[in-house]
């Protein structure tokens, strides 16, 4: 693609990661990563998927949120055409976080997606669609199969957002907070500790 567009100098700044089946091109301050279409399946006791080659449709179906299931056609006949089977562009414009498929399946398959929903809502100042949020509440105990490191990574992204309180309010309302940060949850309602407030 890079060579066909006459961007020879960019071609020199490409990286191929064969183990992951990805390639990356750097152009000025932009990094673009290319990944082949994949299909995933999960076992109930793990969030690590079994990954196989798949179609674009398979790949879009496995995405966490509609706003992350957008694709652009690179074929010559339809170059640049948006492929948006879940109306992700509408959700992007409306500021809504929603899963492309049944949210109970989405969050049960990969419980970290519950944290990602809250993180995206916090960072982007979006709202979480009602049924998607209800599914977070219903599946919250599945977060226990996620490593602390992955949870901390999402918490750090919430804390460094422009309004982290939004994330903590959503974590509290979804009842995820006592599961991932029981010490903070225990402080709820306390105005002073050791005379400090």
Locate predicted features:
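Catalytic cores of the polymerase beta-like nucleotidyltransferase superfamily
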Residues: 4-197
């Amino acid at each position: 693609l890079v060579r066909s567009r006459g961007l020879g100098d960019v071609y020199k700044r490409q990286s191929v990661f064969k183990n992951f089946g990805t390639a990356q091109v750097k152009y000025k301050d932009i990094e673009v990563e290319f990944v082949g279409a994949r299909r995933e399946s999960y076992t109930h006791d793990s969030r690590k998927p079994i990954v196989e080659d798949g179609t674009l449709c398979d790949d879009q179906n496995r995405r966490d949120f509609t706003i992350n299931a957008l694709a652009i056609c690179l074929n010559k006949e339809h170059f640049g055409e948006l492929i948006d089977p879940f109306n992700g562009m509408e959700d992007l414009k409306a500021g809504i976080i929603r899963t492309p498929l049944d949210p109970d399946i989405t969050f049960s398959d990969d419980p970290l997606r519950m944290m990602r929903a809250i993180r995206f809502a916090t960072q982007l100042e979006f709202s979480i669609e009602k049924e998607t949020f209800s599914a977070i509440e219903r599946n919250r105990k599945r977060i226990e199969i996620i490593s602390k490191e992955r949870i901390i990574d999402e918490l750090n992204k919430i804390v460094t957002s422009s309004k982290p309180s939004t994330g903590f309010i959503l974590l509290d309302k979804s009842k995820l907070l006592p599961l991932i940060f029981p010490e903070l949850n225990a402080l709820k309602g306390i105005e002073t500790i050791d005379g400090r407030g």
